[in-house]
Amino acid sequence: MNTAIVYISSDSYVMQTGTSIYSLFENNMHIKKMDTYVISTGISERNKKKLRDIAFRFQRKLDIIDEEKLIEKYEFGGGG
């Protein structure tokens, strides 16, 4: 079974996000395949590295996707 987890965070909330990711990885080592994503709404490169370091420590994959790239890839908006 493949498990997918998605977070949305900014620099203002990245410490809590990192704590949650650490707990997720530490308490779910029995799950072999876990895809974890963070949608960044302004996370600094320094803090992105810290999040990636957590994933590396647990040998997990963590994808960080910038919000702007999602908006460019998909057309979001109101109206028809």
Give short role names for the model-derived ranges.
Residues 9, 13, 36, 40-41:
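Short secondary-structure transition/capping motifs
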Residues 25-29, 55-56:
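N-terminal cationic-hydrophobic initiation segments that often serve targeting/anchoring roles
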Residues 28-37:
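Short loop->beta transition adjacent to catalytic acidic/histidine clusters or analogous donor-positioning motifs
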